[in-house]
UniProtKB/Swiss-Prot annotation:
Protein name in UniProt: Peptidyl-tRNA hydrolase
A family per Pfam: Pept_tRNA_hydro
EC number: 3.1.1.29
GO biological process: protein quality control for misfolded or incompletely synthesized proteins; rescue of stalled ribosome
Catalytic activity: an N-acyl-L-alpha-aminoacyl-tRNA + H2O = an N-acyl-L-amino acid + a tRNA + H(+)
Swiss-Prot/TrEMBL keywords: Cytoplasm, Hydrolase, RNA-binding, tRNA-binding
GO terms, molecular function: peptidyl-tRNA hydrolase activity; tRNA binding
Natural source organism: Helicobacter pylori (strain Shi470)
Length: 186
């Protein structure tokens, strides 16, 4: 089994903020597959079992995401872990993949690294840098950023669909990496 985790913060206060990119992409995937999340108090997360994947949205708040991930990872005895998360070191519209490595200062990844190790796959979605890291990651996208954000999130969702069917991280990485943002017609 593979644990596929979208990072974000629970509650309406943080809905659709830059830091909730992982939640939003998983929500879009679940909707397209005509599935739904259910809350698991055991893992303090919303989860959905689909094929041989456990899709998970930790409800611990970002800085404690590792608690939910570790709980689900141990319970389901998953072999692979893929984390979908925002990355402020990437421009808005960029989608990249990584296997292992550092957390880049991302508190959700720090929590996962501490409790689970840093040996997992990542789908990184660029949100660009802004003035003041905390304010920026907890802010919503500006209206003029929405078309590019939507295109990048759709691209990331399609990458996840490909991964669910192929179980091939390297093929997903080769096919879906966007080093530069997509061109959006106005």
């Amino acid at each position: 089994m593979t644990l596929l985790v979208g990072l974000g913060n629970p509650t309406l206060r943080y809905a659709h903020t830059r830091h909730n990119a992982g939640f939003d992409i998983l929500d879009s995937l679940i909707s397209e597959l005509d599935l739904s999340f259910t809350f698991s108090s055991k893992h303090n997360a919303c989860l959905c079992v689909y094929k041989d994947f456990i899709l998970l949205k930790p409800q611990t708040y970002m800085n404690l995401s590792g608690e939910s991930v570790l709980s689900a990872k141990n319970f389901y005895k998953t072999e692979e872990l893929l984390i979908v998360h925002d990355d402020l070191d990437l421009d808005l519209g960029v989608v990249r993949f990584k296997n292992g490595g550092g957390n880049g200062g991302h508190n959700g990844l720090k929590s996962i690294d501490l409790l689970c190790s840093n040996s997992y796959y990542r789908l990184r979605v660029g949100i660009s840098k802004g003035m003041g890291v905390i304010e920026h990651v907890l802010s919503k996208f500006h209206k003029n950023e929405e078309p590019l954000k939507n295109a990048a999130f759709e691209h990331a969702k399609n990458a996840l669909k490909f991964f669910i069917e192929s179980h091939d991280f390297n093929a997903m990485q080769n096919r879906f990496t966007l080093k530069k943002p997509l061109k959006i017609e106005s």
